[in-house]
A protein has these predicted regions:
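Active-site-proximal loop/hinge segments that shape catalytic or ion-binding/gating pockets
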Residues: 88-118, 122-123
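Conserved double-stranded beta-helix
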Residues: 212-213, 226-229
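Short alpha-helix boundary/capping and kink motifs at helix termini
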Residues: 13, 19-53, 58, 62-65, ...
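Non-Sec secretion/translocation targeting segments of pathogen effectors
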Residues: 1-4
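A short, basic-hydrophobic beta/loop patch
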Residues: 37-51, 55-91, 96-97, 158-218
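Glycine/charge-rich catalytic "coupling/switch" loops of P-loop NTPases
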Residues: 7
Length: 229
């Protein structure tokens, strides 16, 4: 049986986004504990996202005009079950990366509550990178930030979704992979929703997961503290 990996977080997604999905084919079905679970496909190979569990719950949410439903995202690992290296090394992991076929609408403040951002971007620290190859002077930083701000202040463009990678950090914790500046501006502009595309590759070996979860939580806390103090 293929290894089914689950997101570390539950995401409050617009129920209309989930209702639009077809049910997961019988040959890919696996038992899951969460009421609503979406199995992401692979946009590059034409595999579509499907609803693994929770059709009735989604219908109820639509009938009740609920603004969101809690969704667990799942994927089949592209990395071998006993591969103890690839999931921890970004260049290796990138070879196996898949992207969801659909985008999903989530309130940006709800994403922030999940504590999955690796950096909190504001006007003050926009386009400041530790890598000197990506150095921008003050004028260029301001220009780029203002350009992005002006393009977003009237609404979020779904053509530029955030990339949230499932189990990105140490194969155990979801994090925002791309889109930190968009997240910051969406919150600054009080946008109700942002578009999110999920990506994935693999998960840490199960025997290591309890320890790695503790390390990952400490890691992201320290990363945010160091970058935003």
């Amino acid at each position: 049986m293929r290894e089914l990996c689950l997101s570390s977080e539950l995401y409050p997604v617009s129920p209309a986004d989930i209702a639009a999905l077809a049910d997961t084919p019988a040959d890919l079905q696996q038992h899951v504990k969460d009421e609503i679970t979406v199995l992401i496909g692979d946009s590059q190979s034409g595999q579509t996202d499907t609803l693994l569990s929770g059709r009735d719950a989604v219908r109820r949410a639509l009938a009740e005009n609920a603004s969101s439903v809690p969704v667990r995202f799942a994927f089949f690992s592209k990395i071998g079950r006993f591969d103890f290296i690839t999931v921890f090394v970004k260049p290796l992991r990138a070879r196996y990366k898949i992207f969801s076929s659909n985008i999903y609408h989530i309130a940006p403040l709800e994403i922030r509550k999940l504590k999955i951002e690796r950096n909190i971007r504001t006007k003050e620290n926009a386009y400041v990178f530790s890598n000197s190859l990506f150095y921008y002077d003050e004028a260029e930083r301001k220009r780029q930030y203002d350009e992005l701000y002006n393009s977003m202040k009237r609404g979020y463009d779904d053509n530029f979704p955030l990339d949230v990678m499932l189990l990105r950090m140490m194969g155990i914790k979801d994090t925002v992979n791309q889109g930190h500046h968009r997240m910051g501006i969406a919150i600054e502009c009080k946008l109700p929703l942002v578009a999110v595309r999920f990506s994935a590759a693999g998960a840490a070996p199960r025997i290591l997961q309890p320890l790695l979860k503790v390390i990952a939580d400490i890691n992201i806390t320290l990363k945010l503290w160091n970058k935003n103090k």
